[in-house]
Amino acid sequence: SIFTDSNENNSESIFEFQLSQDATNSQMGRNYTPLNYKMSQNFGWFRVNADVFEIHRNMYPNDPRIDATYMYDYTHAITGAPQRTYPAITTRTNVRASHPFLFKFAEKDKTHSNQYNSQNIVVYRYADLLLMLAEISNELQNGQQLGYVTEVLNRVGMTPQVGFLGSQEEFRDAIMNEYRFELIGEGEDAHNNRRRGFDYFLNNTILTHNTNTNPGFKASVDILLSTDPTGTMTLPIPQSEINTNELINN
């Protein structure tokens, strides 16, 4: 995985924040590392919706990116007891056990006990560029789109799924899924989900989640996403900011 201390600034990386637990005080690892995965100072607040995981797994069952992206089965760093969440357990009886952790930015050293860690934050990498070029090529219909996607997938021993081999519209849907499979959690999820407009966001993200059958939407552990464009396509400005901004006249 490129998301390790030992594989920082590799040939795929275009821009990384250079971090050190002794200087920059990054709490990324603390926030992403599953509870009790390492010795101390970790919370694992950030998860991936179970249905997003299943879409990825169903599309590419043998994808090595899955283990590099998600964490759902590990041992307690102190007691050695098994710690499992979905899909290692499928009952989904409570929120904590219902969604896998996002493992990319987690601290990988189980003996680590510092509040901060040293793993760099990858801001932009070559795979992101290739997917963008594939998307552009598909819109231009210049015949280059499949080559870019193939380069991304071949590096992990995979080949493009069938959606990339169909029509322009089918390729468009496939590339938007590929952004998610490859880049989830790297800072562009909200933008990528929305940049094709509300209708596309509604049909390919919101309703896909709200009506999913694998593992199945469950009100007690899943968030029902709003279908109101006024609340989903804009980022509300806090009233306190509006009240104190002297450049706003009315």
Tell me what each language-model feature is.
Residues 1-29, 64-250:
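Acidic/polar-rich alpha-helix caps and helix-coil junctions
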Residues 34-53:
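Short, cationic low-complexity segments
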Residues 56:
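Non-catalytic, low-structured ubiquitin/UBL-interacting segments
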